[in-house]
Structure formats: structure tokens, C-alpha cells
Amino acid sequence: MLWKLLLRSQSCRLCSFRKMRSPPKYRPFLACFTYTTDRQSSKENTRTVEKLYKCSVDIRKIRRLKGWVLLEDETYVEEIANILQELGADETAVANILERCPEAIVCRPTAVNTQRKLWQLVCKNEEELIKLIEQFPESFFTIKDQENQKLNVQFFQELGLKNVVISRLLTAASNVFHNPVEKNKQMVRILQESYLNVGGSEANMKVWLLKLLSQNPFILLNSPTAIKETLEFLQEQGFTSFEILQLLSKLKGFLFQLCPRSIQNSISFSKNAFKCTDHDLKQLVLKCPALLYYSVPVLEERMQGLLREGISIAQIRETPMVLELTPQIVQYRIRKLNSLGYRIKDGHLANLNGSKKEFEANFGKIQAKKVRPLFNPVAPLNVEE
């Protein structure tokens, strides 16, 4: 039925267009109602739609994304657009922001100005602020718990986090800032105590904590009980305080995202796959903490991918860090090494392992050895007269 109505409206529009003697100078206002039923458009706030249209906003995108904002009686299109323009956004940027985050128009201007001042605490200038808003409009226009947000920003600054890191957390981990500041302080204290209890020093603890929060701020959404249970379980598995400290240093807060059950499953899988003793398994885990972090299905997929490439269990055991690579990355790197005549299954996996930058550096060295001339063609020859 809907497609018939749409077809009929399109044909009527075409007939009326043919009757026109000359095309209109401006796009008709009713054109913004394309692809909507008469019933839906009759409920929309026409003043809101008209103001959005004046801002060059694609109304169809808003209808698809958050059509409910067009039904609201009270909206602030002009006010929000003015605030964005004051920060340096041009007409195109304003339109893009409103299209990506339509709920911005139902935010009260006073609350948006408060949010603006809050984010300016960690932005060098308005140019940097508007760039952040353009990239993450949803985070900026999540207007709630502003007092909590402000207190948390100040708390993270006192801890020593740089403003550039805090601004990144505001956009990527906004839930952390909606936490009561006392809860975040409690979690930070527990993290500090956990690090010190396994033998970490005060000086190293501060560096570790700042890296942890910048890499995995969601740790603050955990419960204190979960952190204690994870550490106690590792101790029950025979890990010493020093070994747990090593895991904390490598995995940062990701260790606390693991529950005892998932750790147990990963340990059992690795022990069975490598056919090793408890002591040997601990050494493997310390070399490659991913054996704890990744789930059994992920480890199994990566192990099978390596075996299909002709790599043996013994090679994987010697360089377990290769399990941090996805099967796709492994295949790509093996093809590149094969192009130089390097047979990975007959050699060491060190050249396959590492970050993208490390792999490219190793590949470059192998390539240089491959094409290096046997003698230096520009060196003078010692010729006896």
C-alpha cells in the first residue's frame, strides 16, 4: 500500500510540474517531505523542518536517523546553529553536525553553552573544540550529569592525565565522565593498591596508572569486587606476585576485564594445545599475555590459521606472540616474505611477528640482504701496477 501511495504522489508531482510555465527560482519547501507519508509529515513541527531546511540540512537523513526530533514541540535549531557558528563552524559543518546528531536541536542552549565551557577546559582553543564536535557530535550533545563531568575532568587533570588524553576520553568513553566522581576515585585507589600489593613501586605505579587510563578508561566502569577476584584467581593458578606484576605491566587494565572463568578456559585450551606443564604454560603466558586475554574461539581460529600455513606447534610455542595476529595479517605477511624466497615454515617466526612498523622494518632488512651486491661497485679497486 505504501509504495502505491508513493507512486501516486510522484506521478501527481510530475503532472503538476509539466503544467508549470517556468521552473521556480528556489526549491519548494514541500520538497523536503519526500519519502514520507502525509500522516507522518502532518505530525512534524513545520517550523523545525523549515529552520533545518534554511540551515541546508538534509531532512531525509534526519527522518531516517532520528525522526522523532521533528515531532518535538520545542526545538532550538537557530540557537544551536549560532553556538556552532560562534565556535567557527561554517554552514556546511553546521549542517553535517545536525544531520549526524539531530537530537542536538532539542538541547537547551544554556546547557549547550555549559557543555561548551566544560570541553574548553581540555581544548587549547575554539578551533580544536569545533573539530572535536564535528568528529564526535553525539558525545558533545549528550547533555547530562554536567557537574559530574566537570568534577571528573578536574580529577583526571589532578591525576596527571594530559588534556589531549582527557579530550579523547570525553569523546570515546563519555560514560566514564557520567560516573559519580567518588566512584572513579574509589576505582583509582583500588587499582593503585592492587599494583602496590603485587610488588610495584610508587614511581612505576603512577606511570602504569596513567597509561592504563589512557588506553583502557572503561576499567573505571568495573566493580572493585571483579578486580580482586581476578587477582586472587591468578594467585590460585600459581602465578607469583612478581609474575602478576609483569602481566599488569603488559596488559594494563585489560587484565581486569577478564573473569576467572574465561581465564580458566583460555589456560585449559593453551595447555592442551601446546601439551605443556603448568610451569611451561606460565612462561608462555608471560611471553604472550594474549593467551589469557583472547577467548578460546579466537585462539583456536588463529592457531588453525597458522597450522594451515605450514607452521608447526613447536614454532608457535617458541614465538607465541604470533597469536596476537589475525589470520588475515598472517596470510598477508607470509605472502610478502614468500615473494623474497623466505620460507617461514622452515625458519623462525620472529620475522612474521610484531607490529606493522616492526614487520615492515624486518621485511626491509631481508629485502636489502636479498638485493645487496657481492661487492661495492663504487669502491676503488686495488690494482697492482
Swiss-Prot record:
Transit peptide: 1-35
Example of a GO cellular component annotation carried by this entry: mitochondrial nucleoid
Domain of life: Eukaryota
Chief location bin: mitochondrion
Example of a GO MF term: DNA binding
Subcellular location: Mitochondrion matrix, Mitochondrion nucleoid
Pfam family, one: mTERF
One GO-annotated biological process of the protein: regulation of DNA-templated transcription
Keywords per UniProt: Mitochondrion, Mitochondrion nucleoid, Transcription, Transcription regulation, Transit peptide
SMART domains hit by this protein: Mterf
Known function: Binds mitochondrial DNA and plays a role in the regulation of transcription of mitochondrial mRNA and rRNA species.
Quaternary structure and interacting proteins, as annotated: Monomer.
Family as reported in the entry's similarity comment: Belongs to the mTERF family.
UniProt-listed PANTHER family: TRANSCRIPTION TERMINATION FACTOR 2, MITOCHONDRIAL, TRANSCRIPTION TERMINATION FACTOR, MITOCHONDRIAL
Protein name stated in the entry: Transcription termination factor 2, mitochondrial
Provenance organism: Pongo abelii (Sumatran orangutan)
Lineage: Eukaryota, Metazoa, Chordata, Craniata, Vertebrata
